[in-house]
Amino acid sequence: MKINGNEIRPGNVIEHEGGLWAAVKVQHVKPGKGGAFAQVELKNLVDGRKLNERFRSAETVERVRLEQKDYQYLYENDGMLTFMDNETYEQIELSREWVGDRAAFLQDGMKVTVESHEGKALGISLPDQVVLEITETEPTVKGQTATSSYKPALLENGVRVMVPPFITTGERIVVDTNEVTYLRRAD
């Protein structure tokens, strides 16, 4: 679908220079002289490169709609992560390297959303929060709770986060998967 340069919004995916790019930041500029334009920060969906472009209002770009499909995480085998489509029971494999650091937060049976274009996976969305157990953290020192200091903790998936001093080894906490930060104790 073709759209004008001034209609680009953050989150839109456009076809540009032979690739698919996501608009990260968009700033509309109307200078005193000349026509209005949109200053757009783009991120390549395949290799992650960033690019700044100007699109004039009269210029048209091809907006791409990504297919979003829900999958269930099954298991990992030799660096390949296996997901199952809940409707067709079809399985797909994505490399752990392609999923990136967020692969550490995958849990058996977790529902994820895979974004694809023309059958090629471009992105994966995990739930915003997961519950994990702390396997190792320093003990609380009496009197240390007066200040708002944080201490490092190792989670069951091998990821390190900073937690408040009252959190102890063996507790289950809620972690933000986007920022990789402690949110609260799990219920």
Curated annotation (Swiss-Prot):
Family matches, as Gene3D superfamilies: 2.30.30.30, Nucleic acid-binding proteins
Superkingdom assignment: Bacteria
Localization, UniProt: Cytoplasm
SUPFAM superfamilies, A to Z: Nucleic acid-binding proteins (SSF50249), Translation proteins SH3-like domain (SSF50104)
InterPro entries tied to this protein: Elong-fact-P_C, NA-bd_OB-fold, Rib_uL2_dom2, Transl_elong_fac_P/YeiP, Transl_elong_KOW-like, Transl_elong_P/YeiP_cen, Transl_elong_P/YeiP_CS, Transl_elongation_fac_P
GO biological process per UniProt: peptide biosynthetic process
CDD domains in alphabetical order: S1_EF-P_repeat_1 (cd04470), S1_EF-P_repeat_2 (cd05794)
Described function: Involved in peptide bond synthesis. Stimulates efficient translation and peptide-bond synthesis on native or reconstituted 70S ribosomes in vitro. Probably functions indirectly by altering the affinity of the ribosome for aminoacyl-tRNA, thus increasing their reactivity as acceptors for peptidyl transferase.
Protein name as catalogued: Elongation factor P
